[in-house]
Amino acid sequence: MATNLKDIADQYAKAIFELSSEQGNVEDTRKDLDTLKVVFENNPNFVTIVSSNDINSEARDGLLTTLTTGASEAIQNLVKLLAYNNRLNLLTQIVTSFEDYYNDAHGIVNVVATTAVALDETRLDKLAAVFASKTGAKHVNLTNNVDESIIGGVILQSQSTLIDGSLQTKIAKMKAQLLG
């Protein structure tokens, strides 16, 4: 049984991912969820308004129907279920967990490349290719984070892998060897 909100969100995400996989509409579900996430992020008071006791159920249902117009029946039902269980506040976490399931199923890995200076697209593409070859990922989404304190080199980090080729780490290791 789920004990924390992240676990609860993960259960919803897994259920909607499995359902959309069975129905063959994972891409549509993903787009619908991304759209909802944007709405929730751009309107932080939406959950408070919809969950308020000051709003009657007819108005609440109308807002939720308007929100999910054009979305699949599964997404419409998910939003209604979340509202019924007072869990609309979990929607953005559900979308994040859904993306994790989607990425795992498609061999997609999100990686942060930390460098001392910003890298151009050519270098980022080369780093993505190197990371993919070392980890077996089918596709790598690489973002560049600039941190001058690493001095030089690169640190590649995904959810499960860390490759530290920074000069800062190399210098620290040399220092430890010399002093140790």
UniProtKB/Swiss-Prot annotation:
Q: Which Gene3D superfamilies match?
A: N-terminal domain of the delta subunit of the F1F0-ATP synthase
Entry annotated with the keyword Metal-binding: no
Q: Topology versus the membrane, per the UniProt entry? A: Peripheral membrane protein
| InterPro entries membership | ATP_synth_OSCP/delta_N_sf, ATPase_OSCP/dsu
Q: What does this protein do?
A: F(1)F(0) ATP synthase produces ATP from ADP in the presence of a proton or sodium gradient. F-type ATPases consist of two structural domains, F(1) containing the extramembraneous catalytic core and F(0) containing the membrane proton channel, linked together by a central stalk and a peripheral stalk. During catalysis, ATP synthesis in the catalytic domain of F(1) is coupled via a rotary mechanism of the central stalk subunits to proton translocation.
The entry sums up its family as follows: Belongs to the ATPase delta chain family.
Complex and partners: F-type ATPases have 2 components, F(1) - the catalytic core - and F(0) - the membrane proton channel. F(1) has five subunits: alpha(3), beta(3), gamma(1), delta(1), epsilon(1). F(0) has three main subunits: a(1), b(2) and c(10-14). The alpha and beta chains form an alternating ring which encloses part of the gamma chain. F(1) is attached to F(0) by a central stalk formed by the gamma and epsilon chains, while a peripheral stalk is formed by the delta and b chains.
Native organism? Leuconostoc citreum (strain KM20)
How is this protein annotated for GO cellular component?
A: plasma membrane; proton-transporting ATP synthase complex
Return the protein name: ATP synthase subunit delta
Which residue ranges traverse the bilayer? none
A Pfam family of the record is OSCP
Cell compartment(s), UniProt: Cell membrane
Q: Which UniProt keywords apply?
A: ATP synthesis, Cell membrane, CF(1), Hydrogen ion transport, Ion transport, Membrane, Transport
- MF annotations from Gene Ontology: proton-transporting ATP synthase activity, rotational mechanism
Q: Which residue positions does the secretion signal occupy?
A: none
Keyword Transmembrane helix present in the record's keywords: the answer is: no
